[in-house]
Swiss-Prot record:
Regions of compositional bias (Basic residues) in chain numbering: 384-393
Family: Belongs to the SH3BP5 family.
Biased composition (Low complexity): 317-332
Coiled coil residues, start to end: 59-140, 169-272
Modified residues (Phosphothreonine): 13
Positions bearing Phosphoserine: 30, 49, 343, 350, 358, 362, 378
Role, per record: Functions as a guanine nucleotide exchange factor (GEF) for RAB11A.
Gene Ontology BP annotations: intracellular signal transduction
GO cellular component, one term: cytoplasm
Keyword Coiled coil: yes
Protein's recorded name: SH3 domain-binding protein 5-like
Organism: Pongo abelii (Sumatran orangutan)
High-level lineage: Eukaryota, Metazoa, Chordata, Craniata, Vertebrata
Compositional bias annotation for Gly residues: 304-313
Length: 393
């Protein structure tokens, strides 16, 4: 059986076992609730106060997600854009090098056959314009036919009841007539445009035929060069379209990023405005009253002091209206003076405000008589209500 040893504090510890050190003067600490999953090392992490947790707007998380998504998309698309531009420049350099090599082998026949291939390019463009003009003309003709059918229906509705003119059908007829006129103008415009581009296309085709007859030998010798050039041109156009599409994607992602950032700024401004609205316009606490001897404003007059001032003002008014009479009781004057001093002491922040006051008035009741004589103005009237106090301790 293990031998037990007596240790301070009344506990027994078996021999050979360690016992915890006992600090008698140690003050027990209140348990601190740990955050779930945070561990003991998270005490240095910043924690939100309850007020900040209440004021967190759920839109912040949503806008932050939009911001992160836009940022990731910008990074990815910019990498793709850099690769596409690099590929475009590489293909452009290779095509220029191969074309220069091919041109050095063929010689002057390339320059002789160049007008023919240029005329072919213009003829192809004119043919495409002719097709577009034909589509516009067909669309205008369809609109014109639909407008004429609408006019026909409106006329039938108007003529259905000959004895009464329906304003609804009349309005529909006027609207359909306007549509017919607009469609007719569009049809005529499309017809003239189609005729113009058709003439240009015919002229381009005629020029191609003429150059083909004139430059038959040079065209045959330079055909490999221009075919290779057409292949490279098509490849470059495809890569250029890809670069343009990636640039548009980057611009759209940056627009979304700026919108999310602007929304976060607006939310932050709204939160700060709400916080400023919750705070009181003036700091809380007792208001500082006017010092002794200063003219008290209407807002500085307290409830406790109004009764004393009213009593004193009434005494002054009675003294001035009745003229010289018997002196008031000494006990009454002393009581009024003591109340005045007590009120002044309550209104002041410290006794330092009482320094420098006049010593001509004491607590023996001379104050009321002196003030009653000095309150009379040049016109014989007496100022009532507010008065200036001068007290010495």
């Amino acid at each position: 059986m293990a031998e037990l040893r007596q240790v301070p504090g009344g506990r027994e510890t078996p021999q050979g076992e360690l016992r915890p050190e006992v600090v008698e003067d140690e003050v027990p600490r209140s348990p601190v609730a740990e955050e779930p999953g945070g561990g003991g090392s998270s005490s240095s992490e910043a924690k939100l106060s309850p007020r900040e947790e209440e004021e967190l707007d759920p839109r912040i998380q949503e806008e932050l997600e939009h911001l992160n998504q836009a940022s990731e998309e910008i990074n990815q698309v910019e990498l793709q854009l850099d690769e596409a531009r690099t590929t475009y420049r590489r293909i452009l350099q290779e095509s220029a090098r191969k074309l220069n090599t091919q041109g050095s082998h063929l010689g002057s026949c390339i320059e002789k056959a160049r007008p023919y291939y240029e005329a072919r390019r213009l003829a192809k463009e004119a043919q495409q314009e002719t097709q577009k003009a034909a589509l516009r003309y067909e669309r205008a003709v369809s609109m014109h036919n639909a407008a004429r059918e609408m006019v026909l229906v409106a006329e039938q509705g108007v003529m259905a009841d000959k004895n009464r003119l329906d304003p609804t059908w009349q309005e529909m007829l006027n609207h359909a007539t306007c549509k017919v006129n607009e469609a007719e103008e569009e049809r005529l415009r499309g017809e003239r445009e189609h005729q113009r581009v058709t003439r240009l296309c015919q002229q381009a085709e005629a020029r191609v035929q003429a150059l083909q007859k004139t430059l038959r030998r040079a065209i045959g010798k330079s055909r490999p060069y221009f075919e290779l050039k057409a292949q490279f041109s098509q490849i470059l156009e495809e890569h250029k379209a890809k670069v343009t599409e990636l640039e548009q994607q980057v611009a759209q992602a940056k627009t979304r990023y700026s919108v999310a950032l602007r929304n976060l700024e607006q939310i932050s401004e709204q939160i700060h405005a709400r916080r400023r609205g919750d705070l009181p316009p003036h700091p809380l606490g007792p208001r500082r009253s006017s010092p002794v001897g200063a003219e008290a404003g209407p807002e500085d007059t307290g409830d406790g002091d109004s009764g004393i001032e009213g009593a004193e003002g009434a005494g002054l008014e009675e003294g001035s209206s009745l003229g010289p009479g018997p002196a008031p009781d000494t006990d009454t004057l002393s009581l009024l003076s003591l109340r005045t001093v007590a009120s002044d002491l309550q209104k002041c922040d410290s006794v330092e405000h009482l320094r420098g006051l006049s010593d001509h008035v004491s607590l023996d009741g001379q104050e009321l008589g002196t003030r009653s004589g000095g309150r009379r103005g040049s016109d014989g009237g007496v100022r009532g209500g507010r008065h200036q106090r001068s007290v010495s301790l």
